[in-house]
């Protein structure tokens, strides 16, 4: 954990906030109050659930691919830093 850079921490925290927000919306507890009459149909509920699932999946894939979280990724980052190709 000592060797995780600031960018990874910030992206991880923002991802966590986004995932909590989507989960709350999915279970009917929106952070921003929305009138109940705005969501009446099954299509709206399915759209919300599908949107949340897509957001979660896409966020996790992007986070995993854009951060050096595996041992191989950490070695790649070291090589890139030695060559001056990354921060």
Curated annotation (Swiss-Prot):
One Pfam family, please name it. Holin_SPP1
Q: What is its main location?
A: membrane
This protein's membrane topology, according to the annotation, is: Single-pass membrane protein
Output the InterPro entries linked to this UniProt entry.
Answer: Holin
TM region positions? 42-62
Keyword Metal-binding: yes or no?
A: no
Keywords recorded for this protein, A-Z:
Membrane, Transmembrane, Transmembrane helix
Q: Where in the cell is it found?
A: Membrane
Any one cellular component term from GO for this entry? membrane
Top-rank taxon, per record: Bacteria
The question of whether Signal is a record keyword is answered with: no
Q: Which residues form a coiled coil?
A: none
Under NCBIfam families, the record lists: holin_SPP1
Q: Would you identify the family this protein belongs to, as annotated? A: Belongs to the SPP1 holin family.
Name by which UniProt lists this protein: Uncharacterized 9.5 kDa protein in ORF3 5'region
| Protein species of origin | Bacillus licheniformis
What does UniProt list as this organism's lineage? Answer: Bacteria, Bacillati, Bacillota, Bacilli, Bacillales
Task: Report which gene this protein is encoded by.
Answer: xpaL2
């Amino acid at each position: 954990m000592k060797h995780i850079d600031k960018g990874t921490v910030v992206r991880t925290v923002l991802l966590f906030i986004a995932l909590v927000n989507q989960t709350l919306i999915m279970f009917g507890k929106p952070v921003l109050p929305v009138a109940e009459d705005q969501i009446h149909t099954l299509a709206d509920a399915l759209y919300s659930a599908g949107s949340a699932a897509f957001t979660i999946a896409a966020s996790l894939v992007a986070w995993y691919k854009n951060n050096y979280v595996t041992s191989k990724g950490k070695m790649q980052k070291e090589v890139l830093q030695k060559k001056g190709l990354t921060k």
